[in-house]
Amino acid sequence: MTEQHACVSELLARSHRLGADPRNTNYAGGNTSAKGTSTDPVTGGDVELMWVKGSGGDLGTLTADGLAALRLDRLRALEGVYPGVEREDEMVAAFDYCLHGRGGAAPSIDTAMHGLVDAAHVDHLHPDSGIALACAADGEKLTAECFGDTVVWVPWRRPGFQLGLDIAAVKEANPRAIGCVLGGHGITAWGDTAQECERRSLHIIRTAEAFLAERGRAEPFGPLLAGYTGAGPAGRRERAAALAPFIRALASQDRPQVGHFDDSDVVLDFLSRTEHPRLAALGTSCPDHFLRTKVRPLVLDLPPTAPLDEAVARLRQLHAEYREEYAAYYARHAGPDSPAMRGADPAIVLVPGVGMFSFGKDKQTARVAGE
């Protein structure tokens, strides 16, 4: 049995710690990497490698098989043949020719971010606090107020090779920087050791949390909306059980879906506030989230005291409108090479006074969409 490289052991331990706390990143969101020297099995000489979380894996449960191992010399040589942002997808395919040995995971679109940054360890995460800054209209200004020159703003760019070049340039130009906030996306941190990188990631996340708590309003979702607090737990669950078959049928028009229900305090509080219709309609801020949630939820615009048949009729009407709007949204943004639309049904349905219904192909996917 081949002994695991020390860099891999450290990387897995760091990934598990970061991925265990949902404040740090969403399920299967973000990626981590480590660079180190290994032995070329053909020549017996030294070879510089990077181990990075592969496509689709989850930090909290990452294994060695979920890592992609790439030769740094080949990866960095791609900078000389990079054809530009119009052909980003070709670069992801090129990563396969930088792999070291057999097995492991497929490299993700974020691979360049890790390989091009001149640091032994890199974390890229999607924490709520970081996304709040990244997606704010004045995110660049807020980032500077929060961190000074230790965390640098990087304007929105589609994930890919050019974003990796952007972040590498930011690090080189800002020697005091420990990381950056990626506009509309998340955060990236780096360090000379695994411990330093993790410490810096957590510092960015917790500092942003404290900054937002200090600057935020006491009631960010507005005051309570009269008549929207709902019944107690027993009445709420009874209403949820009555609505669930109808809602799942609506969410399964394109293909059968498994449902998950959440009536936690944070969900109920949001749905009891005056701002919830406006904020829900704005949609999801982070692109990594709406891969699972779609761009916005369907929200029942009736109080929990409305008769059941009235609520069901309104849900059917809202669902028809949602499908029409989602198809139009897809048509507006799809390109010639875009994948086919993956259905127009909502993945998230919010019912004031009752809770959140989330949907997916299986139990785990439905639960994660809700998370």
Residue ranges of predicted features:
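Glycine-rich flexible loops
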Residues: M1-E371
